Amino acid sequence: MSRRLFTSESVTEGHPDKIADQISDTILDALLREDPTSRVAVETLITTGLVHVAGEVTTKAYAPIAQLVREKILEIGYDSSKKGFDGASCGVSVSIGAQSPDIAQGVDTAYESRVEGDEDELDRQGAGDQGLMFGYACDETPELMPLPIHLAHRLSRRLSEVRKNGTIPYLRPDGKTQVTIEYDGDKAVRLDTVVVSSQHASDIDLESLLAPDIREFVVEPELKALVEDGIKLETEGYRLLVNPTGRFEIGGPMGDAGLTGRKIIIDTYGGMSRHGGGAFSGKDPSKVDRSAAYAMRWVAKNVVAAGLASRCEVQVAYAIGKAEPVGLFVETFGTNTIDTDKIEQAISEVFDLRPAAIIRDLDLLRPIYSQTAAYGHFGRSLPEFTWEKTDRVDGCGRPPVWRADLLPLVH
């Protein structure tokens, strides 16, 4: 088999772009908590000493946006100008308008209801925009996620944990990780390189303090966790690069401006799957950029969990104002155990991919989104992440899902 290297990256919650994502989703949650029917599209720009929040919102709720912004920044850990930002004293500018009535009419009264006279309640809500969304799953990890992004997220999360719990007290909130894994064909076989870049206090020696601490308290525990999870990966002799530029004292918004929606590959599958281009954070679930991407993860994960393929990528496409998708495509990269046409047929029978049905089946009108905004939207076993359930493998609550005549090889 041919050997190749594949790389994915992650960032900590203190990365400027991730601060912006978390602020946008915190505002979204506050509005959904009071009014689950809120229509929200909130973007955040953060730079030295200033946060600017803009977008379109139609809601009956009230959210103290400036207060929410400051609380989130302080929670992340930016509480001093020495760290590059202070949530207590930063400026907050808000420019929020209402959702365009031209968009609202297509969402509130879908083409099927408005033009075709369809009375099905689920046909009343149209897609909030045109677009294409992808979902992906594979059997490389128990979470059915690609191993490179899985490990990169775990390293980023631990980097934040050892900062917050005082294990490495001189770390600051901004940080990045990157993982390069060698594949033999489609099988992950060896860890090649780990890159960890972390903002730190001044006067910290890289070689004698930071690098050994990162290896001992961040990287090695996560490699041990892989073994405990039953993931077989050769890790002897991997290369560890810690802050390869040298000093990393200036970080956060002082080092780089942050924007909502600039980490869409980190948010999804680390580049292992295609991406439709739409970001997630700050968008309520009437926006199919978000809800349909979650649904596609749900679909792909159930396909792999059912044993129909070891790798599955699913694409769905919508027209603005229409409820029914205009396209569905399944790719299994040659790993399918039955014909992909039958998998696609089963998906169409098992999953209702109209926006209102996705929102209903995944219970997406809850204030659950701020916790999605760092360390990945997929592959996390949290009860709020309903799109991670494999509840359609055996047809729970519905007629037999993976029907014997459609899927003869399923266990």
Swiss-Prot record:
Cofactors, names only: Mg(2+); K(+)
Name of encoding gene: metK
Region (Flexible loop): 99-109
GO (cellular component) term, any one: cytoplasm
EC number: 2.5.1.6
Species the sequence originates in: Streptomyces spectabilis
Keyword list, A-Z: ATP-binding, Cytoplasm, Magnesium, Metal-binding, Nucleotide-binding, One-carbon metabolism, Potassium, Transferase
Annotated ATP binding sites: 15, 174-176, 247-248, 256, 262-263, 279, 283
Main localization, broad class: cytoplasm
Signal peptide: none
Family: Belongs to the AdoMet synthase family.
Binding site for Mg(2+): 17
Binding site for K(+): 43
GO-annotated biological processes: one-carbon metabolic process; S-adenosylmethionine biosynthetic process
Descriptive protein name: S-adenosylmethionine synthase
